Amino acid sequence: MGRLFVYDENMTDERAKITVAKMAAVSDIVASEKAFIQYSAAGQLTVLAGAVIAVGDAIFQTEETTLSAANLDGASSFAHGKDYYIYLCDNGKDSSNEVYLISENSTFPDGVEWDDTNTRKIGGFHYGFVRNVDEYGREVNTSGSVRGSGWESNVREDIAPNSVWTALHRPKCDPSGMAYLGNGLWADIYLASDDGANGLQSVYNATPITGTEGLIWLCNANFSNFGNCDNMG
């Protein structure tokens, strides 16, 4: 369906008509399914139809759309160990539908025409090693045997299916480098490492926090507002 509202002073375009149904649907993001972006095939995601999304002063209603590396804002392929962010973009033309871009940028996509006023981050995912499983989600080896010899190394590079998040289906914290385990639980994909800003992160190929950093690092990172570390017992 694309652009849900347009300006037409003669009201001949159906999209210019404000109806009770339209107004009832419009808020920040409205979707019948919170996970309105889903893994659908190797290297592909599907945006489900019917989500209503505001971008600046424009409002769009999604059609079922397949996203892939072709939607990247610069590169031609996904890179191993990277987090990607999915944007719905408005080019400002009433005759045009929404534009989907995938970017490593967490603010807005690359391109002189895009900024934080005409793009909306609606989801994201992590790209890396994914274990091959059968239709029931059980780990298999290259011969298809459940937990058969060598199953541990039977992996592929792909979008991690349970890392896909949306603005409505995500953890309360930054979802980068995380995966959904079910029952409302999200977890880091990688062992926690120092983000360089007195916090932790889940990123590929980083040195994990080992515990040998000691209490001093912990105090500086998390307890700077609670007095001297010597008083912590």
Regions from the PLM with identified roles:
Residues 33-53, 113, 158-179:
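Carbohydrate-recognition beta-sandwich/jelly-roll modules
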Residues 90-97, 191-197:
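Acidic glycine-/aspartate-rich tracts in secreted/extracellular proteins
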Residues 132, 136, 141-143, 164-233:
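Short aromatic-cysteine micro-motif
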Residues 16-83, 92:
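Glycine-rich, flexible loop motifs
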Residues 15, 92-109:
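Short, surface-exposed terminal/edge motifs of secreted or surface/virion proteins that either
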Residues 1-19:
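Short, intrinsically disordered N-terminal pre-domain segments
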